Amino acid sequence: MKSQAGLLLLIAVPAMASASALAAPREDLLAGYAAQAKQDDPGFAGFSAARGEAFHRRSFGRGKVDTPACTSCHADDPRAAGKTPAGKIIDPVALSASPSRYADPAKVRKWFGRNCKEVLGRACTAQEKGDWLSFMLSQ
């Protein structure tokens, strides 16, 4: 009995450490976006997954013609796979469907940089990034 408990502990501790290691970069990203959002707007009161969801589904029409909204490539349901205009399959953007997503801050910055310009025709604000990321982390 003790050996089974010990074995479970040996398995559970690294798994929890791994999950915590993946969460840290996401928390750091949100903290950085929050600091920037507060600098941009002293009235900033925090991120909202509801605003992030509205942002994800909104059609902007100011970027590329074939990508007027996040949902142009990423599915309306963030837990489902998406598809680029060229037909390439994109992994789901919801954390629950892609657990390792958003663990690499450089990739997150790269994709926000590219996708915001293509959809909005400009860089996303820190609040937009934090709201959208909060929505994806809640899914």
Regions found by a protein language model. Give the residues of each.
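C-terminal capping alpha-helices of c-type cytochrome domains
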Residues: R109-Q139
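The canonical Cys-X-X-Cys-His
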Residues: T67-D77, W132
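Electrostatic cytochrome c docking/interface patches
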Residues: P25-G63
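Short cysteine/histidine-rich zinc-coordinating motifs and their immediately flanking basic loops
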Residues: G82-I89
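Solvent-exposed, acidic/flexible segments
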Residues: D41-A49, G63-T67, R101, P105, ...
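N-terminal signal peptide c-region/cleavage motif recognized by signal peptidases
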Residues: A12, S18-S20
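Short microdomains enriched in Cys/His and/or Lys/Arg
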Residues: D91-A106
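Bacterial N-terminal signal peptides that target proteins for export
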Residues: M1-L8
